[in-house]
């Protein structure tokens, strides 16, 4: 008979939930406002493993290692800051909560990094590169400059909202049963 291998989960959700419950109980019992109740190592290790695992997801595979390290750091920070909001009486899946906090932090980091890259490109195009200087034109490849222009305009277009982009109220054009309520003459 074939024996199934146990599935390896890098974070045990039940142990993590129990650690969070213990930490929040200790936090609630803390009477001294100057005393900081630290999260234990189980929670910290789980947050680090979840952030590291999420960085390997296909959504984030194309980013450089430096961006990924920044994303992981932001994810860990967001998870630690927001873990006190986790309602252990209502939800039993802290892994999903931490993953969502990390995911949102990753997306915010990507937006921030893209904005910084757009600033660098804009500075280069407007202050460094001079198309009227023959020496500069000879040094710089035209496809490189065109690529920078394309990336810069793509970012600028993504930040502007078109006037018709606001959410409109949905008008229900589906057939109604109002004709049943009309009074017969």
Swiss-Prot record:
Annotated phenotype, changing residue 13 to A: 40% loss of transcription capacity
Documented effect of changing residue 97 to A: 65% loss of transcription capacity
Record's keyword annotation contains Transcription: yes
Complex and partners: Interacts with the host RNA polymerase catalytic core formed by RpoA, RpoB, RpoC and RpoZ to form the RNAP-gp55 holoenzyme. Part of the transcription activation complex containing host RNAP, the viral RNA polymerase sigma-like factor, the late transcription coactivator, and the sliding clamp. Interacts with the terminase large subunit; this interaction may load the terminase onto DNA for packaging.
Effect of residue 83 to A: Loss of interaction with host RNAP core
Effect of residue 70 to A: Loss of interaction with host RNAP core
Swiss-Prot/TrEMBL keywords: DNA-binding, Host-virus interaction, Nucleotidyltransferase, Sigma factor, Transcription, Transcription regulation, Transferase, Viral transcription
Name this polypeptide is given: RNA polymerase sigma-like factor
Annotated organism of origin: Enterobacteria phage T4
Region spans: Chaperons the template-strand ssDNA of the transcription bubble: 114-153
Effect noted on mutating residue 77 to A: Loss of interaction with host RNAP core
Gene Ontology biological process terms from the UniProt entry: late viral transcription
GO molecular function: DNA binding; nucleotidyltransferase activity; sigma factor activity
Residue ranges of the region described as Interaction with host RNAP core and recognition of the promoter specific element: 13-113
Sequence similarity: Belongs to the Tevenvirinae RNA polymerase sigma-like factor family.
Protein task: Plays a role in the transcription of the viral late genes by acting as a late promoter recognition subunit. Associates with host RNA polymerase (RNAP) core and thus replaces the host sigma-70/rpoD subunit in the complex. May also play a role in DNA packaging by interacting with the terminase subunit gp17.
Phenotype for residue 82 to A: Loss of interaction with host RNAP core
UniProt keyword annotation of DNA-binding present: yes
Site label Interaction with host RNAP, positions: 70, 74, 77
DNA-binding region coordinates: 114
């Amino acid at each position: 008979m074939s024996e199934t291998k146990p599935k390896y989960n890098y974070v045990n959700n039940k142990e993590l939930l129990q650690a969070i419950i213990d930490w929040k109980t200790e936090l609630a019992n803390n009477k001294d406002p100057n005393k900081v109740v630290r999260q234990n190592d189980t929670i910290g290790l789980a947050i680090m493993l979840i952030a590291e695992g999420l960085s390997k997801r296909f959504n984030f595979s194309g980013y450089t290692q430096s961006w990924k390290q920044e994303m992981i750091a932001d994810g860990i920070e967001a998870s630690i800051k927001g873990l006190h909001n986790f309602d252990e009486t209502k939800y039993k899946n802290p892994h999903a909560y931490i993953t969502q906090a990390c995911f949102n932090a990753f997306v915010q980091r990507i937006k921030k990094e893209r904005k910084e890259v757009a600033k660098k490109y804009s500075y280069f195009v407007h202050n460094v590169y001079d198309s009227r200087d023959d020496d500069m034109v000879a040094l710089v490849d035209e496809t490189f400059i065109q690529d920078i222009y394309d990336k810069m305009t793509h970012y600028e277009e993504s930040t502007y909202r078109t006037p018709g982009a606001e959410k409109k109220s949905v008008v229900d054009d589906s057939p109604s049963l109002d004709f049943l309520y009309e009074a017969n003459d």
